[in-house]
Amino acid sequence: MSDGDYDYLIKFLALGDSGVGKTSVLYQYTDGKFNSKFITTVGIDFREKRVVYRANGPDGAIGRGQRIHLQLWDTAGQERFRSLTTAFFRDAMGFLLLFDLTNEQSFLNVRNWISQLQMHAYCENPDIVLCGNKSDLEDQRVVKEEDARGLAEKYGIPYFETSAANGTNISQAIEMLLDLIMKRMERCVDKSWIPEGVVRSNGHTSTDHLNEAKEKGICGC
């Protein structure tokens, strides 16, 4: 796809504590590479990737492909950047929430991150995929899989164990998030009612229309 040759531009936000591997996960997804020497993200950065999304119909048939331009925003996890990070929440359509399987505190802080999303995202029930990262460091693991899955079930969100080092489940997690977003859009009767985190190729976007749709009970926020 050439520049501008897409149906939707969709913004995802990766968030979580500092050092959980957000930058490495996004780099692995967009470039297929791992760099263990990334410096800590200061403020906000982003990466991009073009994908084709095909939804399965009720009869199992694969629908027409939608050309998607993904913007994957990488946020600083440090507390001193929190106000800057939350300012970007409302502009994102989906959220990849990461914690470090070798760092229990990063797992305990997941609840705080979800609370922040519920307060600052475009609606109180945004689409989130939870990722326990660094699954390749099995000998250093301190967070049990059943605990992580239990937390994800409590919030009703998908859970993946990922590794930026070898790429395990990274594409699957982001594809799941994209699928949630596209299905939310499909639940809107009028496809012009799409949040700011989604931009059509003609540049049109409207949070006001999304709010109107929510008030009428049309859109699935």
UniProtKB/Swiss-Prot annotation:
Q: Which GO terms describe its biological process?
A: antigen processing and presentation; blood coagulation; complement-dependent cytotoxicity; cytotoxic T cell degranulation; exocytosis; exosomal secretion; melanocyte differentiation; melanosome transport
Enzyme class comes to hydrolase
Q: In which organism is this protein found?
A: Canis lupus familiaris
Its primary localisation, in coarse terms, equals membrane
What are the protein's UniProt keywords?
A: Acetylation, Disulfide bond, Endosome, Exocytosis, GTP-binding, Hydrolase, Lipoprotein, Lysosome, Membrane, Methylation, Nucleotide-binding, Phosphoprotein, Prenylation
> Could you tell me which residues carry Cysteine methyl ester?
C221
Tell me how this protein assembles. Binds SYTL1, SLAC2B, MYRIP, SYTL3, SYTL4 and SYTL5. Interacts with RPH3A and RPH3A. Binds MLPH and SYTL2. Interacts with UNC13D. Does not interact with the BLOC-3 complex (heterodimer of HPS1 and HPS4). Interacts (GDP-bound form preferentially) with DENND10.
Q: What is this protein called?
A: Ras-related protein Rab-27A
GO molecular function annotations of the record: G protein activity; GDP binding; GTP binding; GTPase activity; myosin V binding
UniProt-annotated location(s) = Membrane; Melanosome; Late endosome; Lysosome
Which parts of the sequence form the motif Effector region? 38-46
Residues reported to bind GTP: 16-24, 74-78, 133-136, 163-165
